[in-house]
């Protein structure tokens, strides 16, 4: 088992944690026929703390069309919609799985800035899986290396930089 936000994954209360977790995968999965406004409507029924105004602010900030079907979104637009959804229910933890892979550099920088804004709140954290070292450098305080499901190393980013000279900041 594991512990997430203080709850054991085997405990019954673990299921209630969905309210505190936002997830962005390497692909955005929404029904293709829905538009951004309809996705927001579905999420409002899914999350008790859904903030429609915040969601609308993200749609505007990202320049996402409200009535265009999801199937017609570009990859960058799909990722931005997934991020808007993940952030619009006041999560404490963001789980990001290759959330910036395949994005053009301008969109990636914009997305990373939003994730940085999220972590400025004291009770907010990000768990990120990425092969893009520059993204890890921009977002992470602590880095863990996994290989075949085993934890090989877990240290603060600055200590890794000093001890192993893995990258230069």
Predicted regions and their residues:
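Catalytic Walker B motif of ABC-type/P-loop ATPase nucleotide-binding domains
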Residues: 94-98, 103
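Conserved H-loop
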Residues: 123-132
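Helical segment within the ABC ATPase nucleotide-binding domain
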Residues: 108-122
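ABC-family P-loop ATPase nucleotide-binding domains
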Residues: 19, 25-81
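ABC ATPase "signature
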Residues: 154-155
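ABC ATPase NBD Q-loop/coupling interface
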Residues: 1-16
């Amino acid at each position: 088992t594991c512990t997430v936000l203080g709850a054991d994954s085997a405990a019954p209360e673990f299921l209630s944690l969905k309210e505190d977790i936002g997830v962005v995968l390497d692909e955005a999965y929404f029904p293709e026929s829905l538009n951004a406004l309809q996705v927001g409507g579905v999420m409002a029924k899914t999350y008790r703390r859904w903030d429609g105004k915040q969601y609308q602010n993200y749609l505007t900030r990202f320049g996402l069309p409200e009535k265009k079907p999801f199937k017609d979104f570009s990859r960058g637009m799909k990722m931005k919609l997934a991020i808007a959804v993940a952030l619009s229910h006041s999560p404490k933890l963001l789980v990001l799985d290759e959330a910036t892979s395949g994005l053009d550099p301008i969109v990636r920088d914009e997305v990373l800035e939003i994730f940085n804004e999220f972590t400025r709140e004291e009770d907010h954290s990000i768990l990120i899986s990425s092969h893009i070292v520059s993204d890890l450098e921009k977002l992470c305080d602590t880095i863990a290396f996994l290989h075949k499901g085993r934890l090989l190393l877990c240290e603060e980013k600055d200590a890794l930089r000093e001890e192993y000279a893995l990258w230069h900041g």
